[in-house]
């Protein structure tokens, strides 16, 4: 069939993940199509909107390549309902689609590592058995580490199971509440939030601002939980540290499972970058990937944004993304991070991680593990701060900058010859960038 041939052509131009998650779900609607218009059915409005925005023009072009005529391409979700049971399912899906779910966020494209494995497994279990023992699920951790990705993965999984899913930020919950209060329509508000199968609240920490919001959310939580509705929340801190919240809410947040996400290890960051490149069909060599992973800190959103900007600049300049090219394009980003880092920051992290007193690192002790820690600090200070070698030498009361060069040389030799040592230094660098 011509439509299948066109989609097969499209698969060669996009990443395998994009094809699998979006294009493969399209069904050619032969009855609704004509010579001028080609119609595809998508499983839901979210996917239809996404494909229409990103791929419709490309699909039309490929039809033109095959036939010599460029048709209009329509992506729709309209299907004939064969039974009242099917009708009920579709009504559920339509209700669920008034959410913030992004179909790009799935469990399949979430990169799992030691820093997020427990949160990942908890979210997956909550999706597979909603309203059971993982209820509520409270995922917490610093900004940009993947909490929203997991939250929306729960939503997309449950949506595909025919569940009614409501996914909002705490700000949208508050805006919705205020609007319905002012318009005397709280019955509609409660119908929406208390009769869903799955309620997802992103950044729940902001709900502690007013007593009225807390009161409403308290009753929403109770009613949903009593009906075995699944509740998943994300926050930047664990429940007992939430400010402004009543104890009765904090206690309820702890009823189910609390799962934290911590900054990713270096190998997890590398895997995340590789996954992003695979999804967006961006080629970065190993050196560039390692450079980004070790210099961009832990905020995944910032890392992904940096990759997109780097690729866009390379395309505009028609340049290959070499390590030197990446360093040049990203120099301002890296410089900004380095300006926030000083020697005290580095000593604080290194002393804590290597279990050596800061005063020992600053001393002239020749004990082997202290010497090594001091050399690591010097190496990282040259790499991560704006300090010159004479300034570093002065800080450690060394004769001149040649002593700094000697210490850096020793660390470079160890990095080149000892993979475990190299990994340890990279992890230290990673923690400093995050803290800085």
UniProtKB/Swiss-Prot annotation:
It is found in: Cytoplasm. The keyword Cytoplasm applies. One of its GO terms (molecular function) is ATP hydrolysis activity. One of its GO terms (cellular component) is cytoplasm. Residues 315-436 are annotated as: Domain IV, binds dsDNA. SUPFAM superfamilies: P-loop containing nucleoside triphosphate hydrolases, TrpR-like. One of its GO terms (biological process) is DNA replication initiation. Residues 100-314 are annotated as: Domain III, AAA+ region. ATP binds at residues 144, 146-148. Residues 69-99 are annotated as: Domain II. It comes from the Bacteria. Keywords: ATP-binding, Cytoplasm, DNA replication, DNA-binding, Lipid-binding, Nucleotide-binding. Residues 1-69 are annotated as: Domain I, interacts with DnaA modulators. It holds the Pfam family Bac_DnaA_C. Belongs to the DnaA family. Plays an essential role in the initiation and regulation of chromosomal replication. ATP-DnaA binds to the origin of replication (oriC) to initiate formation of the DNA replication initiation complex once per cell cycle. Binds the DnaA box (a 9 base pair repeat at the origin) and separates the double-stranded (ds)DNA. Forms a right-handed helical filament on oriC DNA; dsDNA binds to the exterior of the filament while single-stranded (ss)DNA is stabiized in the filament's interior. Oligomerizes as a right-handed, spiral filament on DNA at oriC. Domain I is involved in oligomerization and binding regulators, domain II is flexibile and of varying length in different bacteria, domain III forms the AAA+ region, while domain IV binds dsDNA. HAMAP family: DnaA_bact (MF_00377). This is Chromosomal replication initiator protein DnaA.
């Amino acid at each position: 069939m011509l439509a299948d041939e066109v989609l097969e052509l499209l698969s060669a131009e996009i990443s395998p993940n994009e094809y699998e998650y979006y294009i493969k779900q399209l069904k050619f609607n032969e009855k609704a199509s004509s010579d001028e218009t080609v119609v595809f059915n998508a499983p839901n409005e979210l996917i239809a909107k996404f494909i229409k925005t990103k791929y419709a023009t490309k699909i039309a072009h490929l039809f033109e390549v095959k036939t010599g005529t460029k048709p209009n391409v329509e992506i729709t979700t309209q299907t004939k309902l064969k039974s009242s049971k099917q009708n009920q399912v579709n009504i559920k899906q339509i209700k669920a689609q008034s959410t913030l779910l992004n179909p790009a966020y799935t469990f399949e494209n979430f990169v799992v590592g030691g820093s997020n494995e427990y949160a990942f497994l908890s979210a997956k279990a909550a999706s597979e058995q909603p309203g059971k023992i993982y209820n509520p699920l409270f995922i917490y951790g610093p900004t940009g580490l993947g909490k929203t990705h997991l939250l929306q993965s729960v939503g997309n999984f449950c949506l595909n199971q025919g569940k009614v899913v409501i996914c909002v930020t705490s700000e949208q919950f508050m805006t919705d509440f205020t609007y319905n209060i002012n318009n005397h329509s709280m019955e509609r508000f409660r119908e929406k939030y208390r009769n869903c199968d799955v309620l997802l609240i992103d950044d729940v920490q902001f709900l502690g601002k007013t007593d009225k919001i807390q009161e409403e959310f308290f009753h929403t939580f109770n009613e949903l939980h009593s009906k075995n509705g699944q509740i998943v929340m994300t926050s930047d801190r664990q429940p007992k540290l939430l400010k402004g919240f009543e104890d009765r809410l904090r206690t309820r947040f702890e009823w189910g499972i609390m799962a934290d996400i911590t900054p990713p290890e270096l190998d997890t960051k590398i895997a995340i970058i590789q996954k992003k490149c695979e999804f967006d069909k961006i080629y970065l060599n190993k050196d560039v990937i390692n450079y980004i992973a070790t210099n961009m800190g832990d905020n995944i959103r910032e890392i992904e944004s940096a990759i997109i900007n780097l690729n866009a600049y390379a395309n505009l300049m028609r340049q290959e993304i070499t390590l030197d090219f990446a360093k040049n394009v990203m120099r301002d980003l890296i410089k900004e991070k380095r300006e926030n880092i000083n020697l005290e920051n580095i000593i604080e992290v290194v002393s804590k991680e290597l279990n050596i007193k800061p005063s020992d690192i600053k001393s002239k002790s020749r004990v082997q593990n202290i010497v090594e820690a001091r050399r690591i600090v010097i190496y990282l200070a040259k790499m991560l701060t704006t300090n010159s070698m004479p300034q570093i030498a002065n800080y450690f009361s060394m004769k001149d900058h040649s002593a700094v060069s000697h210490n850096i040389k020793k660390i470079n030799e160890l990095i080149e010859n000892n993979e475990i040592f190299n990994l340890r230094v990279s992890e230290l660098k990673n923690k400093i960038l995050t803290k800085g």
